């Protein structure tokens, strides 16, 4: 979806790196990844072990479970997980596995419940994971419910977004670090957008027949925008990008809104501003990829969030949410579909070319090609990705 550029002061200039043109940070000689990284089951298994089992993985936003008993299920590295808010308001993550004989506890993708009960033998767990009911187990000598709480998964929040980490925090294996430490380089960077307070107006799930890395690479450049996104290019020039994060796990910057007031079908703002912005901020949209499965697009009137869930070397589920100021939902001039329809169109254009790339890369004729200087961010993303597989 992005990148291109020219220099301009940033609202975060006093605390963050300067924004630079995409071409200024390009490392000459960079090429796309070899074929095996997109088609090999062995590489995919490595990714699931070294990345998705050992890093902080985005699974949702706290607004999805606003009340006690609200829950959703998700999958990380092949593991089914339950994310639930307890009666005290705390959010927990548990493996979706009964401590009795291993049955899957919850089949729904989301819901509301006063407790978690196994459908097999009715073992029942409190929302904080404690076993509170186990029929006839008092007949078992030495049985203590306190020994059979649900297995918890590391869970933490950043800016209202919920992350889990399957690594063993107690042993520090896999280079485990806390979520606060992981996101320390971004401290305060997105505070103007009030991310923790936003609410989702819509989620669309996309099933894309392409490797998850192709999604990241596509998001990170606008070299393709003129040909692939005519509607977007009319509003936001494909060569208008500047980036302040150009190496490491967090990459991105902004692009300009040259026509209209927002990236919507009408070109008009579709909701109340989500933060306190200066006049020039209403002409900028910020796009950041946060390794390994989060794409964060920050608009003046909404935030678009992509959550990636790799399924196989050639298939990725993408969950896209549009988040708005909660006060906007009360107003008659709230038009969320103006933004949703626009980006649903752009998303589908992107997924199509990603699927074409996957098909071509699978050919015996494929070999890594040279990146353009306008693709400095995908090249940087590749470098960071390879670091985790070594």
Regions found by a protein language model. Give the residues of each.
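Short linear motifs in intrinsically disordered
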Residues: 60-67, 144-145, 283-287, 321-322
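N-terminal pre-ligand scaffold of iron-sulfur
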Residues: 2-108, 154-155
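N-terminal short leaders/motifs
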Residues: 12-41, 103-117, 151-152, 237-272
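C-terminal catalytic domain of Rieske-type non-heme iron oxygenases
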Residues: 3-5, 156, 161-390
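Short Pro/Gly-enriched beta-strand edge/turn motifs at strand-loop
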Residues: 54-66, 134-138, 288-292
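Glycine-rich, flexible loop/turn motifs
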Residues: 29, 33, 101, 127, ...
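Rieske [2Fe-2S] iron-sulfur-binding domain
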Residues: 64-181, 185
């Amino acid at each position: 979806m992005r990148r291109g550029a020219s220099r301009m002061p940033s609202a975060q200039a006093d605390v963050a790196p300067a924004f630079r043109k995409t071409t200024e940070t390009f490392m000459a000689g960079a090429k796309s990844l070899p074929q095996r990284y997109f088609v090999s089951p062995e590489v995919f298994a490595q990714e699931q072990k070294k990345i998705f089992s050992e890093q902080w993985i985005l699974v949702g936003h706290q607004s999805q479970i606003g009340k006690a008993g609200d829950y959703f299920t998700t999958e990380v590295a092949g593991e089914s997980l339950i994310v639930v808010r307890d009666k005290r308001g705390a959010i927990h993550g548990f493996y979706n596995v009964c401590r009795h004989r291993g049955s899957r506890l919850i089949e729904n993708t989301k819901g509301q419940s006063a407790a978690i009960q196994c459908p097999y033998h009715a073992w029942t767990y409190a929302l904080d994971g404690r076993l509170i009911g186990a029929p006839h187990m008092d007949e078992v000598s030495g049985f203590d419910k306190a020994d059979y709480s649900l297995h918890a998964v590391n869970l933490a929040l950043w800016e209202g977004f919920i992350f889990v980490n399957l690594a063993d925090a107690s042993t520090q294996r896999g280079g485990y670090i806390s979520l606060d430490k992981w996101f320390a380089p971004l401290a305060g960077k997105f505070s103007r957008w009030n991310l923790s307070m936003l609410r989702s107006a819509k989620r669309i799930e996309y099933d894309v027949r392409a490797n998850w890395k192709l999604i990241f690479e596509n998001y990170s450049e606008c070299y393709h925008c003129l040909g692939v996104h005519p509607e977007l290019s009319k509003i936001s020039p494909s060569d208008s990008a500047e980036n302040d994060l150009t190496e490491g796990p967090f990459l991105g910057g902004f692009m300009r809104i040259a026509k209209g007031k927002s990236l919507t079908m009408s070109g008009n703002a579709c909701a109340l501003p989500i933060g306190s912005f200066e006049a020039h901020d209403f002409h900028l949209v910020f796009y950041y990829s946060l390794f390994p499965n989060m794409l964060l697009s920050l608009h003046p009137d909404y935030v678009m969030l992509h959550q990636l869930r790799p399924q196989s070397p050639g298939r990725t589920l993408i969950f896209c949410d549009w988040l708005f100021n909660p006060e906007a939902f009360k107003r008659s001039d709230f038009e969320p579909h103006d933004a949703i329809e626009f980006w649903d169109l752009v998303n589908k254009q992107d997924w199509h070319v990603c699927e074409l790339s996957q098909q071509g890369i699978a050919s015996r004729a494929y070999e890594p090609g040279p990146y353009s200087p306008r693709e400095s961010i995908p090249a940087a993303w590749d470098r960071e990705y390879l670091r985790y597989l070594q």
